[in-house]
Swiss-Prot record:
Tree of life domain: Bacteria
Cofactor: a divalent metal cation
A Gene Ontology molecular function term of the record: guanosine-3',5'-bis(diphosphate) 3'-diphosphatase activity
Domain called Nudix hydrolase: residue spans: 6-149
Name of the molecule in the record: RNA pyrophosphohydrolase
Source species: Sulfurovum sp. (strain NBC37-1)
Family membership noted in the UniProt record: Belongs to the Nudix hydrolase family. RppH subfamily.
SUPFAM superfamilies cross-referenced by the UniProt entry: Nudix
BP GO annotations: nucleoside phosphate metabolic process; ribose phosphate metabolic process
EC number: 3.6.1.-
Protein role: Accelerates the degradation of transcripts by removing pyrophosphate from the 5'-end of triphosphorylated RNA, leading to a more labile monophosphorylated state that can stimulate subsequent ribonuclease cleavage.
PROSITE patterns documented for this protein: NUDIX (PS51462), NUDIX_BOX (PS00893)
Length: 157
């Protein structure tokens, strides 16, 4: 008998800099708890919370700023398994099912990774599309490419 896998409902933000559309750069941040892991901000959806509400809350918690404009939403939930090395950190879940949003930082937005007592990220940067997939952690690359390519195809990027 095989156990059914358990996936954590989650939101993720593809963040464009406030310079978009003049300059197309993506926000990525370096996690504090996983060596060399760069990724987009993301986090769980609390019970009774909409994905959009979770997006704003998670941005505030993880980057100290939710002063963004939502440009688009990926039409599907994307499910993936955690790599074996990360599974203990997120017990009892085997992976995540994520709703992705494309957002642009507003001009007056101020990122503050130290806004909360236990920071999720230790540093961040903005990268161009062709640099993005070299920078982010290996197990997120396929999903990120799928999501971003969708937003490009839809004319949102």
């Amino acid at each position: 008998m095989q156990n059914k896998k358990s996936y954590r409902p989650n939101v993720a933000a593809v963040i464009l800099s406030s310079k978009y559309p003049e300059k197309c750069e993506f926000f990525v941040a370096h996690r504090t708890d996983i060596r060399n892991a760069w990724q987009f901000p993301q986090g769980g959806i609390d019970e009774g919370e909409t994905p959009e509400d979770a997006l704003y809350r998670e941005l505030l918690e993880e980057i100290g700023c939710n002063n963004v404009e939502i440009l688009g939403e990926f039409p599907e939930w994307i499910t993936y398994d955690f790599p074996k090395t990360a599974r203990g950190k997120v017990y009892p879940f085997d992976g995540q099912t994520q709703k992705y949003f494309l957002v642009r930082l507003k001009e007056e937005a101020q990122i503050n990774l130290q806004a909360f007592e236990i920071p999720e990220f230790k540093e961040y940067t903005f990268v161009k599309y062709d640099e993005l997939f070299q920078k982010v952690t290996y197990f997120k690359r396929k999903v990120y490419r799928r999501v971003i390519d969708h937003f490009i195809k839809e004319g949102l990027i």
